[in-house]
Amino acid sequence: MADNRDPASDQMKHWKEQRAAQKPDILTTGSGNPIGDKLNILTAGPRGPLLVQDVVFTDEMAHFDRERIPERVVHAKGAGAFGYFEVTHDITRFSKAKVFEHVGKRTPIAVRFSTVAGESGSADTVRDPRGFAVKFYTEDGNWDLVGNNTPIFFIRDAILFPSFIHSQKRNPQTHLKDPDMVWDFWSLRPESLHQVSFLFSDRGIPDGHRHMNGYGSHTFKLVNEKGEAVYCKFHYKTDQGIKNLSVEDAARLPQEDPDYGIRDLFNAIATGNYPSWTFYIQVMTFQEAEAFPFNPFDLTKVWPHSEYPLIPVGKLVLNRNPVNYFAEVEQMAFDPSNMPPGIEPSPDKMLQGRLFGYPDTHRHRLGANYLQIPVNCPFRARVANYQRDGPMCFQDNQGGAPNYYPNSFSAPEQTHSALEHCTRYSGDVQRFNSANEDNVTQVRTFYLNVLNEEERKRLCENIAGHLKDAQLFIQKKAVKNFSDVHPDYGARIQALLDKYNAEXPENAVHTYVQAGSHLAAREKANL
């Protein structure tokens, strides 16, 4: 209703009210030249052709033609906000990172929430993992904690990531989401069982972005002032309480408000209802890692809280909406390799792959100088290096300072305090197959002990409701994997699939032939 609008709907009204005492700015071209007429093109006579000297038109049109930048290959649809991280508990015994320097310290942060597989115009309420990335602007440079709303992931080896994402995206011929592709990949990679079970549980469709937890997911390394190191995992638990959408509400909202999550976050912050999350770590010593019953760097598994309890660290608070979405959210770029001294990577194979993949895609999407974009700029540190030039270099390019190292002219020098922790590794160099590294034990615990009976029922209904659209041989492979977790898990899904399959005509397998095939016309007619 026009008389009962939320802050997001009234953004234009509020912008005008904030400038009520000001005169409108004079309209200009991109180069700052005043414009006398923005409504009528320059032509030779009222019915004549336009003139190429109409720079008002060409300036506007040329910029319009270049407004769009490449969409993120994953996490394209997102919401962003800004705030601070405040330390509430001392963990300097574990890490020398300045972000944890003392209780009460506040560090500015930027956060981006997102879905994974959908395009930038897709709905916020799909069943999909949610990205939950946090950028800490520290005095030692930016720290990007590029997490999700799940503590686990579908795969444990980074070489599978492109194929996994392709399977979740659109079919290369039909350009449709394809259940065959989705479930074929999942069924062939049973390490996905844990994340698939989480995804199809009630938490698979969070109620907006404020009511879900966040996780760094990977295993990281913390290093203290003495050079002592431990492994750790990061958790951020919502202070608003966990809330999820029902399947029915999630199906209704894309028609009514496909941007439900963005709107909810914007309105909460605009009305002073600032969302917050409590930040925790789990810690594991190197000795404990050696004796751990499974690979502690396996992204498809969690560390049991009973053995590695959550240690409180601080609070994440979001108290500012973006001033401009494109400038501060679309151009925001997170890079897991942005780690200040005191925080380092572990041998987690997925993390190792992301250390390269993320900055590489940012350079493609935003350009070689993407770290000069204000939202990505480490504004609390002084950038001093030997990198120069490149497209869209809009700072001073470090003036006349030497652009080579080493040099004899008092240019930036390395600092011993930033040296990485010394870690010893040994073993044969080869491609190790991790496909069969106990893919079911933790999933069984999740199914039997974490979920109650009603949640198990909904989980199986959600899985069957999606799996029913895949071919029968793929259904069979998937059900076997669920049965390996627990016979009841597979049996429930199979019973539901039997009902679906009895109602629908028998699955047909279609064969597609490339143009120029040497098949005889008669053979083609039988396809």
From Swiss-Prot:
Modified residues (N6-acetyllysine): 233, 480, 499
Designated name of the protein: Catalase
Chain sites annotated for binding NADP(+): 194, 201, 203, 213, 237, 303, 305
Signal peptide: none
Residues modified to N-acetylalanine: 2
Top-level EC class: oxidoreductase
GO MF annotation terms: catalase activity; heme binding; metal ion binding
Keywords: Acetylation, Heme, Hydrogen peroxide, Iron, Metal-binding, Mitogen, NADP, Oxidoreductase, Peroxidase, Peroxisome, Phosphoprotein
Entry annotation: catalytic residues: 75, 148
Organism: Sus scrofa
Region feature Disordered, mapped onto this chain: 1-32
Residues with the Phosphothreonine modification: 511
